[in-house]
Curated annotation (Swiss-Prot):
Belongs to the elongation factor P family. InterPro entries: Elong-fact-P_C, NA-bd_OB-fold, Rib_uL2_dom2, Transl_elong_fac_P/YeiP, Transl_elong_KOW-like, Transl_elong_p-like_YeiP, Transl_elong_P/YeiP_cen, Transl_elong_P/YeiP_CS. The lineage of its organism: Bacteria, Pseudomonadati, Pseudomonadota, Gammaproteobacteria, Enterobacterales. It comes from Escherichia fergusonii (strain ATCC 35469 / DSM 13698 / CCUG 18766 / IAM 14443 / JCM 21226 / LMG 7866 / NBRC 102419 / NCTC 12128 / CDC 0568-73). One of its GO terms (cellular component) is cytosol. CDD domains: S1_EF-P_repeat_1 (cd04470), S1_EF-P_repeat_2 (cd05794). The gene is yeiP. This is Elongation factor P-like protein. SUPFAM superfamilies: Nucleic acid-binding proteins, Translation proteins SH3-like domain. GO terms for molecular function: translation elongation factor activity.
Length: 190
């Protein structure tokens, strides 16, 4: 079994009789000598969908669950439900809008390549996105000529409604690459 310091976002823990999907990890370094590093983890309870927060020391042993990952394509929206189709056997996987609320901020209309669903023991757990996505800038302050030398940023609204900081020289209509986990601009899209 792994230690708490080996846990990554997207893993599932079996903790206190609950299946918890890791959504976010904050590492709190000790200020006193001899103190242990604390890992504050935010989870989503797989069965109930509730948000859970727990703290672990770096050397705490945790019980992880082995997941099955299947590549999927976005298929369609049915009211409040989003349906994804398995690329190999065309099995439909259905998520409610609340279950994948954060993922939808990065998903362009029509979906994106390399999306995966995570299942355990036949139970649908989560939708996992690739590391990067290319999105179009819909709204931002106009680009300033000669601003490429400065390192200043400005907010930009993307085609999915997500707002991130981009360099000043970018203008509406340009496609940019976003790092999903860090929510940051990486560069212009190819």
């Amino acid at each position: 079994m792994p230690r708490a310091n080996e846990i990554k976002k997207g893993m599932v823990l079996n903790y206190n009789g609950k299946l918890l999907l890791v959504k976010d990890i904050d590492i709190q370094s000790p200020t006193a000598r001899g103190a242990a590093t604390l890992y504050k983890m935010r989870f989503s309870d797989v069965r109930t969908g509730l948000k859970v927060e727990e703290r672990f020391k770096g050397d705490d042993i945790v019980d992880t669950v082995t997941l099955t990952r299947r590549y999927v394509d976005f298929s369609y929206v049915d009211g409040n439900e989003y349906v994804f189709m398995d690329k190999e056997d065309y099995t439909p996987y259905t998520f409610t809008k609340d279950q994948i609320e954060e993922e939808l901020m990065f998903m362009p209309e029509g979906g994106m390549p390399d999306m995966q669903v995570l299942t355990w023991d036949g139970q649908l757990l989560a939708l996992e996105l690739p590391q990067t996505v290319d999105l179009e800038i819909i709204e931002t302050a106009p680009g300033i000529k000669g601003a490429s030398a400065s390192a200043r940023n400005k907010p930009a609204t993307l085609s999915t409604g997500l707002v991130i900081q981009v360099p000043e020289y970018l203008s509406p209509g340009e496609k940019i690459r976003i790092h999903i986990e860090e929510r940051r601009y990486m560069g212009r899209a190819d």
